[in-house]
């Protein structure tokens, strides 16, 4: 298993949720009494990952207010896809180049600690370099 102190997470939380017909960002919709974003954050923390960057987009102020400065946020002003959202975190990621990065969707409430730990375990022998 990888060293959790060197793991960080990027949570993509810029979705609008057009089909939900609301001004609330999609990751802020509640499932079992908690915003979906909180489920993703909780799973990371339960897996020992506390270094978290949340990428915001649609109605970003709602998410930033909800997070209350507890996590680093990056605003993606134009939603140009998942890859672009991750690219918005490049400066944050460069400061963490010696660790593993987990990328999660902020609207996936059923991720859990065991899934995260399982996803990170094979990366102990993999190394990617940032451009």
Each model region followed by its residue ranges:
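Short, glycine/acidic-enriched capping/hinge loops at junctions between secondary-structure elements
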Residues: 21-24, 64
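Short glycine-enriched, charge-decorated loop/helix-capping segments at active-site entrances
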Residues: 24-30
């Amino acid at each position: 298993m990888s060293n959790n102190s060197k793991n960080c997470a990027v949570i993509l939380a810029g979705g609008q949720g057009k089909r939900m017909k609301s001004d609330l960002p999609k990751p802020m919709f509640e499932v079992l009494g908690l915003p979906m974003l909180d489920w993703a954050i909780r799973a990371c923390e339960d897996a020992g990952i506390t270094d978290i960057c949340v990428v915001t987009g649609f109605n970003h102020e709602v998410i930033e207010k909800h997070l209350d400065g507890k996590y680093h946020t990056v605003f993606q002003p134009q939603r140009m896809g998942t890859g672009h959202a991750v690219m918005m975190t490049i400066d944050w990621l460069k400061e963490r180049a010696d660790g593993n990065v987990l990328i999660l969707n902020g609207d996936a409430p059923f991720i859990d600690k065991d899934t995260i730990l399982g996803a990170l375990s094979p990366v102990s022998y993999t190394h990617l370099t940032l451009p």
